[in-house]
Design a protein with these regions (language model features):
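A conserved regulatory-domain signal marking ACT and ACT-like small-molecule sensing domains
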Residues: 1-77
Length: 77
């Protein structure tokens, strides 16, 4: 398993953080660290995750990008 860092940007909508967390949980990916900041109607999140393989990472990125309210998902390391 490797440690990766994701940046997520989106609308500050009620329940969206919970939805993001559930997507990660459903893929059995471990959250090592999470930091979310809101500014007006937007949020920026930085997640440190432990991901088993590249296939899983690709699934995660695809699912997060498809969420309503999420405008950007980017691997930063």
């Amino acid at each position: 398993a490797s440690e990766i860092v994701l940046k997520i940007v989106g609308d500050n909508e009620f329940g969206l953080l919970s939805t993001i967390s559930n997507v990660i949980k459903d893929l059995h990916i471990n959250i090592l660290n999470a930091n979310f900041e809101t500014k007006e109607s937007r949020f920026v999140g930085k997640l440190v995750l432990q991901v088993g393989n590249t296939n899983l990472l690709e699934q995660l990125l695809r699912k997060l990008k498809s969420l309503k309210g999420v405008s950007e998902v980017q691997r930063i390391s």
